[in-house]
Amino acid sequence: MRILYFDCFAGASGDMILGALLDLGIDVGIFKRELAGLNLDGFDIAVEKKVINSIAVTDVNVIVKEECNHHTGHHHHCERNLADIEKIIDESSLKDNVKRLSKKIFSEIARAEAKVHNKSIEDVHFHEVGAIDSIVDIVGTAICLDLLKVDKIYSSPMHDGTGFIECQHGKLPVPVPAVLEMLKESNIPYITEDVNTELLTPTGLGIIKCVASKFGPMPPMTIEKVGYGAGKRQTGRFNALRCILGNAKEKEKIDDEICMLETNIDDMNPEILGYVMNRLFENGALDVFYTPVYMKKNRPGVLLTVLTDKEHEEKLVDIILTETTTLGIRKTTAQRYVLEREIKHVNTEFGKIRVKESSFGDYKKYSPEFEDCKKVAQELKIPLSKVYDAVNKAILVFEERNENALQ
């Protein structure tokens, strides 16, 4: 399992996160081509190596050519609300998963800003976050995570300084109110450093909060790459954020956190329920199932249960609320143990077919990939069971004789 760990010993900001991710070895040319899909004019991005405290780091600078320039080409003051930013993202040619994550991060920051300024989330205007450089930091981070193809993201506790900083709202205490709002009622551990300035920005915390599934020490893993992203402030210490990329040290059961969405339905056409299930799976649900239940007034109905990770939760909630007759959804956070899984290929008389390998210590088990077997059965017009038999036979050859059937 490929793991990314954010080591935020000196806090976190958007440019530090982006710099550390690029420092892991992402091709800057490919990154810039992906970023061009944002279709946002008026800026250049400079990515260069520098040295801080004798350590090589990557420094990212977004160079704004004009005071502000919307994607339409018209000039505006650099204050955008959430709808403005979502419109830019929706009208871009970015990948769908990059769009979803970018909007999720902006929504998290907007929620915090709206709360501290006593405004609705629709009325709050971004200043720092609405500026081009912060948009690039957030969307750029989503692009990097897509390019890295990690399975799990973890983070250290969040670190911040003390004192006051000057910003568009005047002189504010550190941590700034939006940061405290995002930390409130979260499971994110927070540490105050003896540094008289801001270390943790709303953009930095918003990104980490939305992508990390756990906070704490680095999990056991073999380290593949380490990246450092430069901070801009002079803090009197090594001001950088570190990203560590690696693989799970052992192929064992993984303690995983998921969200369970449930709702009871007794007034829907069952044909539509089947359609809803397909849509939920297509949009990232880990599992979807219906359970027969008896509801009030002795009505037979179904309990719809959807298992999802954090990344896809919001989209799946939208689908349930728009596609079904329900008026509400119950949400439960659950822990689960999962065997690590890898896709392998097995050589059969019908050619190579994928199998799922799951591991627990030295114990391994294999299961044929249904879609591959179905495709072979349909193309060759043979029983599906015959394809399964061929795959299972090849697996036995590998296990019993240790031949090179799996690659």
Swiss-Prot record:
Entry's transmembrane regions: none
Name of the protein: Pyridinium-3,5-bisthiocarboxylic acid mononucleotide nickel insertion protein
Gene: larC
Keywords attached to this entry: Lyase, Nickel
Enzyme Commission number(s) of this protein: 4.99.1.12
Source organism per UniProt: Acetivibrio thermocellus (strain ATCC 27405 / DSM 1237 / JCM 9322 / NBRC 103400 / NCIMB 10682 / NRRL B-4536 / VPI 7372)
Cystine connections: none
GO biological process, one term: protein maturation
Lineage, uppermost ranks: Bacteria, Bacillati, Bacillota, Clostridia, Eubacteriales
Keyword Lyase assigned: yes
Enzyme's top EC category: lyase
Gene3D superfamilies, per the entry: mk0293 like domain, Transcriptional regulatory protein pf0864 domain like
Similarity comment: Belongs to the LarC family.
Physiological role: Involved in the biosynthesis of a nickel-pincer cofactor ((SCS)Ni(II) pincer complex). Binds Ni(2+), and functions in nickel delivery to pyridinium-3,5-bisthiocarboxylic acid mononucleotide (P2TMN), to form the mature cofactor. Is thus probably required for the activation of nickel-pincer cofactor-dependent enzymes.
Annotated catalysed reactions: Ni(II)-pyridinium-3,5-bisthiocarboxylate mononucleotide = pyridinium-3,5-bisthiocarboxylate mononucleotide + Ni(2+)
UniProt xrefs under NCBIfam families: nickel pincer cofactor biosynthesis protein LarC (TIGR00299)
Single GO MF annotation: nickel cation binding
Entry superkingdom: Bacteria
